[in-house]
Amino acid sequence: LIATHKKYWLPSNPLYFPIHVGAEGKDPLGLIGDNTGNNISKKNPDYCELTGLYWAWKNIKTDYIGLCHYRRYFDFLRSDDFFLEHEELNPNNTQEIEKHIQISSENLIKYFTDGYDIILPKASYLRISFSGQYKRDHELADLHLAAQTVNDLFPDYKKSIDIILKGHKIFFKNMFICNWVLFDNYMSWLFPILDEIETRKTKLQLPYYPRLYGFLSERL
């Protein structure tokens, strides 16, 4: 999936499936919208690209699935950087970009034919703790609420969560590629957690922040 909320250059490679996220109530982009079929498109201001993932989970079936963004793609050609970022996606140089993405996609296929189950971004290592980074950039009470919710729903995760919150390792960008079984398991785990966080946050009357569940899912 390529999650996009605006008109932008998109690759023509058939491995990529652009989807208009947050399409509900917006002008069409000429792409399939996350407001069709079984959807949560209205939650996009809070859930970000997750509304596209939810749409895919409920409305399509494929052997492998992944998520990238209209300004960021996995890059399997360079060893120094795992991403093709928006600064390099020059609409005036689409021929070279298409060629790069095509070769990169061929390398991607080799990963799965070699037996890999999932591909993730390279981990980032923070100078401050996992919790400290969230406190610096967001509202720490929301991260604590998320951790408590996971502990209550899945008690076996408690030790791991404690280690992660105190650690310095994180996977940013909400990007991955995996087989459908892993994807289905992940979605079946993630969305009940987010639903419960949303319910608890409402009951506790905690302040509202846009994109909250996108930020939390990146940590989950």
Residue map of PLM features:
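ER/Golgi luminal nucleotide-sugar-dependent glycosyltransferases, focusing on the catalytic module
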Residues: 1-220
